[in-house]
């Protein structure tokens, strides 16, 4: 009978051994979950600042290759900063269409974008903001520009400067969009 009690003792010892039960499994996962939560919280950190770019080289390149003189945004108020800039054009010089796009962050950290192209306003509008609907006119400097609503609900201003077409849009205020449009010369 001594052998039977030994088997019962071994069975009882196995049954209550730590780590061999569901509860033991859960307790062994607790440190792992804590480490994962701490890693996730540590990785969040502070939001990364928006980088600023110099649109000067893109402006110069677009003006060089465009068959019509392209204007460019002049000085903007306060803490506006360019955060994106690119030129879309076919290869070779003096070939159309050339489109210069520059994105800005306003003083209120709202986005404003200017698109300058050598195509008529209607073609540039269709190419860059399909589905925009007319929404009256607004004063820009000494002239009036056509106002539109984009599919995202943002205001868009469209006008001409010399022979070039200019579109200004974004989630910035109407006043900021008008300032950006007036700065294009």
Specify the residue positions occupied by each region the protein language model found.
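Charge-rich, low-complexity N-terminal segments
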Residues: 1-82
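Short, solvent-exposed recognition patches
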Residues: 54-148
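Generic hydrophobic secondary-structure signal
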Residues: 26-42, 76, 102-104, 114, ...
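A short, solvent-exposed beta-edge/loop patch
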Residues: 134-185
């Amino acid at each position: 009978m001594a052998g039977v009690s030994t088997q019962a003792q071994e069975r009882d010892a196995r049954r209550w051994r730590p780590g061999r039960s569901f509860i033991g499994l859960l307790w062994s996962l607790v440190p792992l979950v804590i480490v994962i939560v701490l890693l996730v919280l540590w990785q969040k950190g502070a939001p990364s600042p928006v980088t600023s770019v110099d649109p000067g080289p893109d402006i110069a390149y677009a003006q060089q290759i465009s068959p019509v003189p392209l204007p460019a945004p002049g000085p903007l108020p306060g803490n506006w900063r360019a955060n994106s800039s690119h030129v879309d054009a076919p290869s070779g010089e003096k070939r159309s269409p050339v489109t210069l796009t520059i994105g800005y962050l306003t003083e209120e950290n709202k986005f404003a974008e200017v698109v300058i192209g050598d195509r008529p306003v209607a073609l540039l509008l269709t190419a860059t903001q399909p589905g925009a609907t007319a929404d009256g006119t607004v004063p820009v400097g000494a002239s009036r520009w056509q106002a539109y609503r984009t599919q995202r609900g943002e205001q868009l201003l469209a006008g001409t400067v010399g022979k070039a077409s200019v579109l200004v849009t974004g989630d910035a205020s109407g006043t900021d969009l008008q300032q950006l449009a007036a700065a294009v010369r």
